Amino acid sequence: QMCIRDRGITSYMTTLYYDLPIEDFRYTQQGFNVSGKGQGRLPNVSGEAMCSSSDDISTIGDGTWWGCWDYGKIRRVNYFLKNFPAYKSNFQNTVLADAWMGEAHFIRAYCYFAMVKRYGGVPILREPQEYVGDIESLKVPRDTEKACYDFIAEDLDKAFRLLPDNEEILGKGRATKYAALALKSRAMLYAGSIARYGTVDLNGLVGIDKALANDYFELAYKAVKELEKSKKFSLY
């Protein structure tokens, strides 16, 4: 549950940031800040190491260590998006309250992008699921890969409208509207490339119609142009 005060919301969001699938050198699919022991495994399985070895003497856990299923994070985001608006009027700083909503949309888009680029279409959940005694009601079918990228774009458009344009509102290292634009440009470039160079399979669960490639490239281009217009960033 959320503590509906500034510190409570900040704590809630901090946990979501901590779990973001940021693919740096200390990230595994299971989480951020992998331990020193685990960190040594990454070069071993990526081809970076000069020599690699395997001491896997058991099949227990096979196929699970590298899984990327962000639905725990997505549930926490959906819980926030569903419940926070009822308390939003309690905060005098409406800019900050909007920024928190923008962060939630940004984080959800980030998680979905991490999954869709690995698996193609995945189930889209807009609200937290509740177990009511029937497990079948929780089994949501996969959406198409196109639907997932469109959902990511939708979330990032909302994030762009709600997030501040500087770090002073939320704090250093947290999302701004420009982070939303940057992520959108990257995600839409992926979508356009999948459409142009990939093939559609499984009734659209994997792949995007080639005719839509330029539409996604245009979305990526417009996001970059909006970033350029801010005059806050440059290539180096």
Which residues does each predicted region cover?
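Short, small-residue-rich loop/turn micro-motifs
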Residues: R126-E130, L156, L189-S193
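Short, surface-exposed recognition loops and adjoining beta-strand edges that mediate ligand/DNA contacts
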Residues: Y27-P43, L125-P128, P164-A182, A195-Y236
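Aromatic- and acidic-residue-enriched carbohydrate-binding clefts of CAZyme catalytic domains
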Residues: Q129-V140, D209
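TPR/Sel1-like alpha-solenoid repeat signature
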Residues: H105, L181-A187
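Conserved, well-structured interaction surfaces
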Residues: R7-T14, Y18-T28, P43-Y119, I135-D150, ...
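Short coil/turn linking the two alpha-helices of tandem helical-hairpin repeats
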Residues: V116-K117, P123, Y190-T199
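Short, small-residue-biased leader/transition segments that mark boundaries at the very start
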Residues: M2-I4
